[in-house]
């Protein structure tokens, strides 16, 4: 599911840009 995929990206430091792309406010911290 998309949700589990997003959770996997949270646990994977190799994809910080994907996290920022999904959560722009997350990248501002």
Curated annotation (Swiss-Prot):
EC number: 2.5.1.47
Gene Ontology CC terms: cytoplasm
Reactions catalysed, as given in the entry: O-acetyl-L-serine + hydrogen sulfide = L-cysteine + acetate
GO molecular function, one term: cysteine synthase activity
Superkingdom of origin organism: Eukaryota
Keyword Ribosomal protein annotated: no
Leading EC class: transferase
Keywords for the protein's UniProt record, in alphabetical order: Amino-acid biosynthesis, Cysteine biosynthesis, Cytoplasm, Pyridoxal phosphate, Transferase
Primary residence: cytoplasm
Subcellular location: Cytoplasm
Pathway: Amino-acid biosynthesis; L-cysteine biosynthesis; L-cysteine from L-serine: step 2/2
Swiss-Prot/TrEMBL cofactor(s): pyridoxal 5'-phosphate
Subunit structure: Homodimer.
Similarity field: Belongs to the cysteine synthase/cystathionine beta-synthase family.
UniProt-recorded name of the protein: Cysteine synthase
Species for this entry: Populus euphratica (Euphrates poplar)
